[in-house]
């Protein structure tokens, strides 16, 4: 078999690996790169239409986000994945396509003014909708034949890896003519143990060769936090002051975890004097994904959540829960003075409805803004968690008088101990481990650690090619070792953070422009003139 590493190698986004075996050519994941590149990217070696199958570990955009691009450029083969992943991709890829179209529209308006070349979005909503017809849902733990011909046989099996609803590691059993069967396992993103709702990561049992993620291969999450206790304390103290708890949250995964926690808090009567406090989920994507979480319980829920379902309870439903679908419903939330929880996207506060809720609540000392996920440098969320005293929302300065809090320990990725526990569960050591999906130093560290434990291991570069057969592995091509981004020095880190902030302010400006649609022509002309002057000053 021949492996070509095409993405998320010594990086953490853009997952994609090409496998050629038994006369067939397939892809494992086809994700979108997000954030800054570190290494030169490698394009697909072959035209999209020449691939015969695509196997998908889970729905996150850094693993699935370029699948509509493949379709747009001729791919018509099957996309094998779990049922829950298929369902989530149905909403997430369309949402991604909508963003692509909006960005292309904005860039083309600028191009028309300057005479520059027009661009097309990477893919459209129609592409995202059409590629869903290629998805083939597969159950967990069942071998299925992909190909069976004169050059050999390839079978696939999905194993729950506990990262996201429907996430899986992928085992491929490959029988090439004249050789004994061998199994290669692609770990996908390995989940953190004891996450709410979904099952803990399971091990596939056997691997001759392993492609393994290393996101947190250099750190430990520490003791499991008391999520219910911490969250209950924040709700109680805020409600007692008459304030709201505003939670910026990622629409898929984290929002559902929060609903699970709040249901339990209400069921146990932990909040005194505010027992029926309202909870608003204000994100169309979160609303759709919550419905999918509710429908995919049989294969994906852990024992505790499944027991609730079997007893007639919905783990994501409780009295006082309201889902806001329309803009009018969203606006009405802040017209009610009852202390409440508001969960809204985007998780880093640089777009979406959350910015409206921050505008109405940040200046109120009785309120709390609770962060439940990583906040990237340069984002509004990062500024708030780092103590900003004033921020701008829709062009207006807003004083930060609300309490800023963080619910630590929530992570969908296993730490180094979780990775090691998962690895040691194989029936015997894999003959070779390829380490991917980790920042450069982390992937290198995890590969070195595995070597110290007696494994044969390497962290391949983007574009590297490896040949594996009968337990032996050889590197045929090293790949792209040249870095295009160096951010190790303190000065470089500061520069990078400044650029991130500049970029995010540009995104915010777009939102402000949309917010002013329908305004007086005089005001809009003045606004446009100010932007033009700013562009003329800095376009150099």
Question: Which residues fall in each region the model found?
Answer:
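His/Asp/Glu-rich metal-coordinating catalytic cores
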Residues: 1-55, 60, 64, 71-257, ...
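Short, surface-exposed amphipathic charged segments that create phosphate/polyanion-binding patches used
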Residues: 150-158, 292-300, 420-421, 470-481
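Short, compositionally biased "basic patch" segments
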Residues: 196-211, 297-305, 375-401
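Hard-cation-handling environments
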Residues: 234-380, 392, 427, 442-444, ...
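C-terminal, active-site-flanking charged/polar segments
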Residues: 364, 438-482
């Amino acid at each position: 078999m021949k492996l070509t590493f095409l993405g998320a190698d010594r990086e953490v986004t853009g997952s994609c690996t090409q496998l050629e075996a038994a006369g067939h050519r397939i892809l494992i994941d086809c994700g979108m790169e997000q954030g800054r590149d570190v290494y030169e990217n490698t394009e697909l070696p072959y035209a999209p239409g020449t691939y015969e199958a695509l196997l998908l570990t889970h729905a996150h955009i850094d693993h699935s986000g370029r699948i509509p691009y493949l379709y747009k450029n001729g791919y018509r083969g099957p996309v094998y994945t779990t049922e829950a992943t298929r369902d989530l991709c149905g909403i997430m890829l369309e949402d991604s396509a909508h963003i692509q179209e909006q960005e292309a529209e904005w860039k083309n308006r600028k191009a028309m003014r300057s005479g520059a070349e027009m661009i097309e979005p990477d893919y459209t909503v129609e592409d995202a909708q059409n590629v869903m017809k290629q998805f083939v849902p597969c159950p967990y733990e069942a071998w299925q034949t992909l190909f069976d011909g004169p050059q050999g046989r390839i079978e696939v099996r999905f194993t729950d890896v506990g990262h996201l609803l429907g996430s899986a590691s992928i085992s491929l059993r490959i029988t090439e003519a004249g050789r004994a069967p061998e199994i290669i396992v692609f770990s996908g993103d390995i989940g953190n143990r004891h996450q709410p709702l979904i099952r803990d990561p399971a091990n596939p049992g056997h691997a001759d060769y392993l492609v393994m993620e290393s996101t947190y291969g250099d750190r430990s999450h520490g003791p499991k936090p008391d999520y219910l206790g911490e969250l209950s304390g924040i709700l109680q103290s805020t409600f007692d002051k008459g304030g709201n708890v505003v939670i910026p949250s990622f629409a898929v995964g984290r929002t559902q975890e929060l609903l699970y926690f709040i249901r339990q808090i209400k069921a146990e009567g932990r909040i005194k004097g505010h027992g029926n406090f309202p909870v608003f989920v204000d994100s169309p994507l979160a609303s759709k994904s919550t419905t999918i979480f509710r429908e995919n319980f049989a294969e994906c829920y852990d024992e505790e959540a499944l027991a609730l379902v079997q007893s007639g309870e919905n783990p994501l439903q409780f009295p006082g829960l309201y889902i806001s679908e329309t803009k009018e419903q969203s606006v009405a939330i802040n017209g009610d003075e009852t202390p409440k929880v508001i969960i809204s996207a985007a998780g880093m506060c640089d777009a979406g409805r959350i910015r409206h809720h921050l505008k109405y609540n940040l200046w109120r000392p009785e309120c709390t803004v609770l962060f439940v996920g990583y906040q990237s440098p340069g984002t509004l969320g990062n500024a708030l968690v780092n103590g900003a005293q004033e921020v701008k929302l829709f062009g207006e300065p807003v004083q930060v008088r609300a309490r800023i809090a963080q619910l630590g320990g929530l992570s969908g990725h296993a730490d180094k101990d979780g990775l090691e526990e998962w690895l040691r569960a194989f029936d015997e050591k894999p003959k070779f481990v390829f380490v991917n999906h980790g920042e450069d130093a982390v992937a290198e560290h995890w590969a070195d650690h595995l070597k110290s434990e007696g494994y044969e291991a390497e962290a391949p570069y983007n574009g590297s090619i490896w040949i594996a057969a009968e337990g032996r592995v050889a590197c045929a091509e090293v790949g792209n070792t040249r870095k295009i981004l160096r951010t190790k020095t303190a000065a470089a880190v500061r520069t990078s953070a400044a650029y991130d902030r500049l970029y995010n302010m540009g995104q915010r400006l777009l939102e402000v422009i949309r917010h002013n649609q329908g305004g007086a022509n005089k005001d809009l002309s003045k606004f446009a003139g100010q932007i033009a002057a700013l562009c003329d000053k800095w376009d150099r």
